[in-house]
């Protein structure tokens, strides 16, 4: 060991001496003595490795307390960090889908702080059913006889099939054998549920007679799957639920539908493309309809099944129901969200998903113009900051073809180098509240459709 190396090792402080420093008092109070000591030992080992490999001290050796604070602050950050979603996708699966209404947030907080009547009947002091209150709400909204709630729509489809068709055949159009994110495929779910898939028709055309010819003594269900995340256009043919229900009654086979996104209001009244609604399918005579809670409905992640009382009873008594049931926080948020639908005149104000989807392009354009000047002043040396028209999408497999006119702030590097865009996007992801946009066509786009808190946005980007 050289004299220089020995000198560097001698400059490493003892842990006891560091802990006596006043700058470590607040760190020990915040993070605990044990964790601070563990990190200091780790940092000393790192410093020794740097000395051994490069004959120098790490730069942070000049201020140990500052480095410890920085590392422990980063370590303490939640894995679920709030972000500003400016991707242009309103229901972004990777960013948690639907924002919750204030009523839902308050309901969850109350359910977490206190014991609640999850499965307790106050009238007779006996055991209640956790789905009962929500089932009543869902029946009121959809016109169904009963309802069942599980933890997501994939679970709803699995339970629906396992409880009503295990060991039997389920007839589905070939054009409706969907795959959604995470490799969730209808044929795979059927196998897990113990069903045999009997596909009929072709990818683009399926007729009533295709279903009729497929039905046999082992047929349990006729199934419709709403192709919410893709669209088949051109020379196509599909029969709707009402026609399939009529055929099912003739052949004594119930009809079930996986609706996917599931909107409880007619979106066309807000100028949005119309999606099929559970209440329409119930009115048409479908026995069971499943849909998501955290997509167009605007609530928490949940799988909702509405339909005929006898069919729902089979789901409730199936062993999978307990494995897939929703917890009290989910039920609290979902109940609060559903209650908003009882007052439809205020829905577009109180339900964040609908509020964001219905923002007009003109309003967003004005917002973009208001924000352009301070951002151009801050970033103008490196980037041209412009207001550009763009198209938002709903996301989460909802209305895949339709786009919503919007406006964006775009950042274009003066030197045209894409690496500068990547660097800027990375810097924004490292902010205390990360700002998430998208890089496209030589620009970094910030679609402002989902931006409601302008002050926080500017605080982050003008740092």
Curated annotation (Swiss-Prot):
Keywords: Cytoplasm, Protein biosynthesis, Pyridoxal phosphate, Selenium, Transferase. It catalyses: L-seryl-tRNA(Sec) + selenophosphate + H(+) = L-selenocysteinyl-tRNA(Sec) + phosphate. The keyword Protein biosynthesis applies. GO terms for molecular function: L-seryl-tRNA(Sec) selenium transferase activity. Its cofactor is pyridoxal 5'-phosphate. Pathway: Aminoacyl-tRNA biosynthesis; selenocysteinyl-tRNA(Sec) biosynthesis; selenocysteinyl-tRNA(Sec) from L-seryl-tRNA(Sec) (bacterial route): step 1/1. GO terms for cellular component: cytoplasm. The keyword Protein biosynthesis applies. Its EC number is 2.9.1.1. GO terms for biological process: conversion of seryl-tRNAsec to selenocys-tRNAsec; selenocysteine incorporation. InterPro entries: PyrdxlP-dep_Trfase, PyrdxlP-dep_Trfase_major, SelA-like, SelA_trans, SelA_trans_N_dom. The modification N6-(pyridoxal phosphate)lysine is found at residue 295. It is an enzyme of class 2 (transferase). It is found in: Cytoplasm. It comes from the Bacteria. Belongs to the SelA family. Converts seryl-tRNA(Sec) to selenocysteinyl-tRNA(Sec) required for selenoprotein biosynthesis. Homodecamer; pentamer of dimers. Binds only one seryl-tRNA(Sec) per dimer. This is L-seryl-tRNA(Sec) selenium transferase. It comes from Shigella boydii serotype 18 (strain CDC 3083-94 / BS512). The lineage of its organism: Bacteria, Pseudomonadati, Pseudomonadota, Gammaproteobacteria, Enterobacterales.
